[in-house]
Amino acid sequence: EVCSEQAETGPCRAMISRWYFDVTEGKCAPFFYGGCGGNRNNFDTEEYCMAVCGSVMSQSLRKTTREPLTRDPVKL
């Protein structure tokens, strides 16, 4: 999955400002791209990053969200 890949600068040395989706934070974050190599989690704008990967956050929340535990009152 594109959106779960780590930010990867690549082997070149350009300092191109790009965005990647950070699954830990559940949002897009800036990073510097070297200009070659790298991976597909590399977007020109934050808006485009969120358009592609924003649903990943809601899908992962649905998988990890559980019903709250209900407890019977303790009787002494």
Curated annotation (Swiss-Prot):
It is found in: Cell membrane; Membrane; Perikaryon; Cell projection, Growth cone. Its main location: membrane. Belongs to the APP family. The gene is APP. The OX-2 motif shows some similarity to a region in the N-terminus of CD200/MOX2. Functions as a cell surface receptor and performs physiological functions on the surface of neurons relevant to neurite growth, neuronal adhesion and axonogenesis. Interaction between APP molecules on neighboring cells promotes synaptogenesis. Involved in cell mobility and transcription regulation through protein-protein interactions. Can promote transcription activation through binding to APBB1-KAT5 and inhibit Notch signaling through interaction with Numb. Couples to apoptosis-inducing pathways such as those mediated by G(o) and JIP. Inhibits G(o)-alpha ATPase activity. One of its GO terms (molecular function) is serine-type endopeptidase inhibitor activity. It is a single-pass type I membrane protein. GO terms for cellular component: clathrin-coated pit; early endosome; extracellular space; Golgi-associated vesicle; growth cone; perikaryon; plasma membrane; recycling endosome. Binds, via its C-terminus, to the PID domain of several cytoplasmic proteins, including APBB family members, the APBA family, MAPK8IP1, SHC1 and NUMB and DAB1. Binding to DAB1 inhibits its serine phosphorylation. Interacts (via NPXY motif) with DAB2 (via PID domain); the interaction is impaired by tyrosine phosphorylation of the NPXY motif. Also interacts with GPCR-like protein BPP, APPBP1, IB1, KNS2 (via its TPR domains), APPBP2 (via BaSS) and DDB1. In vitro, it binds MAPT via the MT-binding domains. Associates with microtubules in the presence of ATP and in a kinesin-dependent manner. It comes from the Eukaryota. Keywords: Amyloid, Cell membrane, Cell projection, Coated pit, Cytoplasmic vesicle, Disulfide bond, Endosome, Membrane, Protease inhibitor, Serine protease inhibitor. Residues 1-76 form the BPTI/Kunitz inhibitor domain. A motif (OX-2) lies at residues 56-76. PANTHER family: BPTI_KUNITZ INHIBITOR DOMAIN-CONTAINING PROTEIN (PTHR10083:SF375), KUNITZ-TYPE PROTEASE INHIBITOR-RELATED (PTHR10083). Signal peptide: none annotated. One of its GO terms (biological process) is cognition. This is Amyloid-beta precursor protein. The record marks R13, A14 as: Reactive bond. Disulfide bonds join C3-C53, C12-C36, C28-C49.
